[in-house]
Design a protein with these regions (language model features):
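A short, surface-exposed alpha-helical micro-motif characterized by mixed small hydrophobic
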Residues: 109-111
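Conserved ABC ATPase "signature" region
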Residues: 10, 22-39, 58
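ABC ATPase "signature
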Residues: 127-128
């Protein structure tokens, strides 16, 4: 099935429980957020992973969900779009949405989360306040944490 982004917006919106009328009303807002208007009629199979993520995130966040699960959604795409998505998640959280963010970016976890569950090989290694869990994680490999840009070190 070679759906275009336009068709995918309607399909995924419907899967999320949105009516075609609601999708019609929010279509431009979805497309504008994704910044992919010129690619709307291109089959998704020709999209990069970052482009697919843009469309998916824009659709999933057009409503004010009770819970948003963002599983590595920001691991693809450019920095500016990641920032835009983080801001959208902050807006949703301030409106009462619970965001479950799955990420390998310690910096992103520090910026976005207040509680963290650290998983290692599928098991809970640590759970608690974000600052405490992130500090424990960075203590294991401060060099890797510095590479991710989340730790300032003195020489």
């Amino acid at each position: 099935m070679d759906l275009t982004a336009r068709e995918n917006i309607y399909l995924n919106g419907t899967v999320l429980g949105l009516t075609p009328k609601y999708i019609d009303e929010k279509f431009d807002e979805i497309v504008d957020f994704s910044e992919l208007r010129e690619f709307l009629d291109v089959p998704l199979k020709n999209y990069s992973s970052g482009m697919v993520a843009r469309i998916a995130f824009a659709i999933a966040t057009i409503t004010k969900p009770d819970v948003l699960i963002a599983d590595e959604i920001l691991s693809v795409g450019d920095f500016m779009f990641q920032e835009k998505c983080e801001e959208r998640m902050r807006q949703l959280m301030s409106g009462g949405t619970t965001v479950l963010l799955v990420s390998h970016s310690i910096g992103q976890i520090e910026r976005m989360c207040d509680h963290v569950t650290w998983l290692e090989k599928g098991r809970v290694k640590m759970q608690g306040e974000a600052a405490e869990v992130c500090a424990a994680y960075k203590a294991l490999d401060p060099e890797a944490a510095a590479i991710q840009g989340s730790v300032k070190t003195k020489k």
